[in-house]
């Protein structure tokens, strides 16, 4: 199966989100990655439900919505109504993870769980069969443009093995420091979905960058 590319809106020009969404919409990238940060779970604040709702009419691309927030259960319905297709919560932010995952699915969205760099893959074993996606953070969450953590490759391999052992059909996504010089290696180690922010929106030719990252 060809891998999926999800350009991250966090690295776009916030004064012209219409053009940024249009660029992705006109490209072969399959998803648009939306990073929602609350300034509590991570040391940054990005954007939220009103922005997602505003840009939803601009594209039919999959809205891959990554919640870096505390108490995500409170907002599941609101993100569905805003237009999220995939809703990913952090394992580290959920008290009752299984309940949260089931709430996401009950709204008709795909359910994802993300793990920070310090969280071992083994922490996902019980929940993995219930997931549509696992998001592996290859940088510490909160800011775009950070340096890629090399230990991510081992983590992807371990997750691929765990997925096979548990019979899960979850896609493996990686977010942070994805670029033209490592994207093929990430795929070889198990990634199905690549999130790319700076390497797309910070490139001299974003459309060419998307083509390269899909190769």
Task: Give a label for each model feature.
Residues 177-189:
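Acidic, divalent-metal-coordinating active-site segment for phosphoryl/phosphodiester hydrolysis
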Residues 189-196, 201-202:
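Acidic, Mg2+-coordinating phosphoryl-transfer loop and its flanking beta/alpha structural elements
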Residues 92-94, 116-118, 139-142, 198-201:
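Short, acidic/turn-prone active-site loops that include or flank metal/cofactor-
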Residues 1-88, 92-96, 103-106, 110-111, ...:
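Conserved N-terminal beta1-alpha1 strand-loop-helix module at the mouth
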Residues 118-120, 179:
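Short acidic loop-to-helix transition motifs that present clustered carboxylates
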Residues 66, 114, 173-175:
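Solvent-exposed beta-strand sheet faces enriched in polar/charged residues
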Residues 174-178, 195-198:
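Glycine-rich beta-strand-to-loop/alpha-helix junction loops that act as flexible
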